[in-house]
């Protein structure tokens, strides 16, 4: 691994443009958004509906960047920071794999440059100030039963989904129901990822909805005078992090909102700075095209004024077989063919946005030639560009064919949005459900309708950031492949007025995950020489 300062110098940066975090990590100045103004090409990486283990989207993003470098392209990648929850939960580390990783992987996976702790601290500071205000006389007349801002922690802990605070003597504060969300679902995480500078950051923080008064009036962070101290905690967290891939490609790793319960992409400032310094930027969006990619098209690219010049859609034989209903071990060509319906629907989704995608078939050792041939023939018959990706095993060399296909697909596309910003919220939600998920319609619970009414009273033209299972186009994780004849049910709607969007809660989605029966944490250890093992 090279010293990060060598890579920074190759990027043409001076010492005023960055701060070192040891030998291998750095933070970049926000002022780099204003230099060069290159007309870089932005390539978005998304996926088909995933299995629980994921389909290798991060690995593909990293490997594709390395393949671009081998072809002599001036390229950087942009991915999200890992959350401790999944690292210790079901997926383990989230820094790629094999010969396509970002380094130093153990540092990045475990706390990195301190962004997540800073975001958690800023979030919980507001929670503390809300309760403190109520305790010291409650001048704003906040209703303790109508506090809408939760607490946060970067850990999977189902016991924190619903709690009671203030239990004990009177000096413990008011007794009230409360809850935690995981840090990637925090509105402060979303705000950090969507802010362009410190002024923008403070403005967004000031608009966070804390709760309502006993007379049903909204109370915001600005009313509690919280935004300044919150922004102070986030000063360094807003600056994007730079590391490197296995083969020395510059890698922006910044912010970490989940794609199923938040907007699911790395920060806007990371993408904007990368596009000023490089000719090609490859950025990743969480889960399938119905989640992270939809939000990138409809929210992130709008706020950041970002182009989308190509889309890579990651697929695996494993996921195709799952959606095809495979019940057996080993080769199952018929299941691959049946599961292709899911992949084709994701292709159709990307085409609706006005972009022609390239499918990256992420190869696993268990894949057979017959299975690969079967899906290849289907993609060919539909006129879909595709390539086998072997970047896990071979690094950049294993992504050369994919890189060439992606380069040939790059264009100045006119993006077609799912909804207009000025449309009412019900219409926006229905358009996403029908046009992206393939639903027959939307069922709004009474609470959801009340939430929407309140959101439209206190927000101007908000975006919609759906919270939905990643395992199905529907809101039911058991409806695999290409479901039809369903309606999605909106249980409630969270108001993220600071971030500028509402979050409709579909089905049984949880904003605080739990650990599995055998969490990855059981396999992680620290050796006597200080090496961390079992994380990947």
Curated annotation (Swiss-Prot):
It catalyses: (6S)-5,6,7,8-tetrahydrofolate + formate + ATP = (6R)-10-formyltetrahydrofolate + ADP + phosphate. Its EC number is 6.3.4.3. Pathway: One-carbon metabolism; tetrahydrofolate interconversion. PROSITE patterns: FTHFS_1, FTHFS_2. One of its GO terms (molecular function) is ATP binding. InterPro entries: Formate_THF_ligase (IPR000559), Formate_THF_ligase_CS (IPR020628), P-loop_NTPase (IPR027417). The keyword Repeat does not apply. Keywords: ATP-binding, Ligase, Nucleotide-binding, One-carbon metabolism. Disulfide bonds: none annotated. ATP binds at residues 51-58. One of its GO terms (biological process) is tetrahydrofolate interconversion. Belongs to the formate--tetrahydrofolate ligase family. This is Formate--tetrahydrofolate ligase. The lineage of its organism: Archaea, Methanobacteriati, Thermoplasmatota, Thermoplasmata, Thermoplasmatales. The gene is fhs.
């Amino acid at each position: 691994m090279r010293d990060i300062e060598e890579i920074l110098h190759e990027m043409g940066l001076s010492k005023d443009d960055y701060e070192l975090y040891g030998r291998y990590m750095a933070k970049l100045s926000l002022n780099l958004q204003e230099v060069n103004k290159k007309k870089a090409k932005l390539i978005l990486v998304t996926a088909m509906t995933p299995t629980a283990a994921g389909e290798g989207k991060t690995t593909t993003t990293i490997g594709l960047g390395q393949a671009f470098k081998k072809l002599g392209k001036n390229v950087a990648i942009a991915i999200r920071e890992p959350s401790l929850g999944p690292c210790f939960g079901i997926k383990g580390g989230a820094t790629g794999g094999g010969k396509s990783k970002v380094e130093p992987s153990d540092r990045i996976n475990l706390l990195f440059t301190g962004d997540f702790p800073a975001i958690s601290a800023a979030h919980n500071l507001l929670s503390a100030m809300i309760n403190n205000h109520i305790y010291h006389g409650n001048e704003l007349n906040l209703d303790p039963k109508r506090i809408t801002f939760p607490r946060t922690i970067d850990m999977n802990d189902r016991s924190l989904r619903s709690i009671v605070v203030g239990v004990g003597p009177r000096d413990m504060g008011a007794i009230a129901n409360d809850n935690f969300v995981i840090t990637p679902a925090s509105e402060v995480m979303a705000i950090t990822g969507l802010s362009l500078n410190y002024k923008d950051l403070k403005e967004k923080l000031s608009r966070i909805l804390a709760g309502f008064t006993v007379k049903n009036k909204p109370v915001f962070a600005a009313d509690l005078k919280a935004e300044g101290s919150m922004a102070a905690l986030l000063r360094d967290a807003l600056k994007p992090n730079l590391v490197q891939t296995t083969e020395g490609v510059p890698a922006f790793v910044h912010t970490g909102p989940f794609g199923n319960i938040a907007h699911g992409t790395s920060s806007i400032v990371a993408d904007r700075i990368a596009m000023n310094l490089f000719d090609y930027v490859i950025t990743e969006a969480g889960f399938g095209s119905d989640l992270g990619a939809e939000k990138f098209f409809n929210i992130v690219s709008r706020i950041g004024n970002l182009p989308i010049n190509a889309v890579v859609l990651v697929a695996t034989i494993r996921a195709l077989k799952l959606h095809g209903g495979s019940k057996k071990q080993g080769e199952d060509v018929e299941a691959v063919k049946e599961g292709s319906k899911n992949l084709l629907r994701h292709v159709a989704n990307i085409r609706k946005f006005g972009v022609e995608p390239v499918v990256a078939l992420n190869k696993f050792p268990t894949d057979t030639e017959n299975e690969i041939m079967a899906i290849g023939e289907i993609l060919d018959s539909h006129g879909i560009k595709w390539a086998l990706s072997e970047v896990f095993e071979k690094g950049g060399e294993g992504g050369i064919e994919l890189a060439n296909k992606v380069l040939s697909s790059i264009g100045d596309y006119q993006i077609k949005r799912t909804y207009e910003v000025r449309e009412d919220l019900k219409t926006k939600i229905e358009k996403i459900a029908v046009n992206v998920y393939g639903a027959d319609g939307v069922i709004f619970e009474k609470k959801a309708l009340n939430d929407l009414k309140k959101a439209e009273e206190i927000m101007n033209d908000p975006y919609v950031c759906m919270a939905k299972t990643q395992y199905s186009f529907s809101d039911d994780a058991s409806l695999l492949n290409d479901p039809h004849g369903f309606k999605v049910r909106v249980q409630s709607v969270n108001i993220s007025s600071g971030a500028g969007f509402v979050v409709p809660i579909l089905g049984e989605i949880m904003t605080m995950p739990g650990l599995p029966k055998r969490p990855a944490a059981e396999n992680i250890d620290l050796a006597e020489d200080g090496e961390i093992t079992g994380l990947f």
